[in-house]
Design a protein with these regions (language model features):
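Alpha-helical interaction elements in eukaryotic regulators
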Residues: 10, 34-37, 58, 79-82, ...
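Alpha-helical solenoid scaffolds in large eukaryotic transport, assembly, and signaling factors
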Residues: 11-17, 30, 34
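Boundary/linker elements of alpha-helical solenoid repeat scaffolds
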Residues: 23-28, 222-224
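Central/C-terminal regulatory/activation regions of fungal transcription factors
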Residues: 75-243
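Fungal-biased detection of long, low-complexity, Ser/Thr-
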Residues: 39-45, 49-50, 93, 186-321
Length: 321
């Protein structure tokens, strides 16, 4: 924040980032405040780069937010230009670890990169070594959740058929085969649906219901080898979004935050409409995770981005039902 008062470019880009974030949350577009600060940030960034042979941390932060804005507004060409420019700036300054702001800048760039990878079904540009990292012990966004004692999971409402279903999702993520070809329609087995033979889970409340819809999306895509953004997953993701909108504000325990992150990144990968709404909603939650949780999140989201991209490459062979 201190840098924003000392650097006009940073001042405008922070106000631009805040205004554009509110636009995404509210489903708005074309706010004059957003565009004013965006124009000023671009103008000042261009002047800074032209006037100096070096690139400052505030210049890099400005380019980062410009990339984030274009990515969150699905402006793919503009986002790619800013991303490539940012990558050149970071490399010219010695890489992410050499950036200032006590590590905050490199942390933000990495997180924004993960979000961009999920939205665009592509490899994360930052935060990996030689592209994708393949941990010795594969980790998914569900790993840390399901490793908790059953007593803790049960106290949060994760039990019975729902818990079995989440384990099924986790196992399928760990054993994902990129050579899987698009197959027939998959339907949740009756034993997984427990007391819900018609697939009606709403009576369990929005949190558990959201987990049911997310699990359906995962297994439908993983077992059939089709993209997360396939047409038949759109009904589930719209219901997932409705559940998230109905979450109680006091549902903010450590476990609940991790599940919320999993749900929102699922929605961002799946939705054809309101894709970026999911990332805008989850951003503050990701920033509130502990260092241990963040480490697990980063490993899990890298694996998820890999699967999202591999399944997207199957789109040409997607089976219509």
């Amino acid at each position: 924040m201190q840098a924003s008062f000392q650097d006009p470019c940073m001042f405008h880009v922070i106000l631009f980032a805040a205004s554009s974030h509110l636009e995404v949350i509210r489903g708005e577009n074309g706010n004059p405040v957003t565009h004013y600060h965006r124009r000023q940030a671009i103008k000042l960034l261009s002047e800074n780069i032209s006037a100096s042979r070096t690139v400052s941390d505030t210049d890099i932060a400005t380019a980062m937010y410009l990339w984030h804005y274009e990515s969150m507004n699905s402006h793919l060409d503009e986002a790619r230009i800013h991303k490539e420019g940012l990558l050149q700036m970071v490399n010219a300054n010695g890489g992410l670890r050499k950036l200032g702001f006590d590590g905050f800048l490199s942390h933000m760039i990495t997180l924004i990169g993960f979000g961009d990878a999920i939205l665009s079904a592509s490899k994360p540009v930052f935060g990996t070594v030689d592209g994708y990292q393949v941990p010795e012990a594969p980790t998914t966004l569900l790993s840390a959740i399901l490793q908790r004692p059953e007593k803790v999971l049960h106290s949060s409402g994760l039990n019975g058929s729902l818990l079995s279903l989440l384990h099924e999702v986790h196992d399928n993520l760990l054993t994902f085969d990129p050579q899987t070809t698009p197959g027939d329609y998959w339907r949740m087995p009756l034993y997984m649906r427990g007391g819900y033979p018609d697939g009606n889970f709403e009576e369990d409340g929005p949190f558990n219901t959201a987990c049911w819809y997310a699990a359906n999306i995962y297994l439908n895509s993983l077992k059939r080898g089709i993209p997360f953004s396939s047409d038949e997953n759109q009904m589930f993701v719209e219901k997932l979004r409705s559940c998230i909108m109905a979450f109680p504000k006091d549902n903010d325990g450590e476990l609940e935050r991790e599940i919320y992150v999993w749900l929102c990144f699922t929605g961002a990968a799946v939705a054809k409409r309101n894709k970026t709404w999911f990332l805008a909603k989850v951003g503050p939650t990701v920033m509130s995770l502990s260092q241990k949780q963040l480490g697990e999140f980063k490993r899990g989201v890298i694996q998820f981005a890999y699967i999202v991209q591999k399944l997207e490459s199957n789109r040409s062979g997607e089976v219509e039902v």
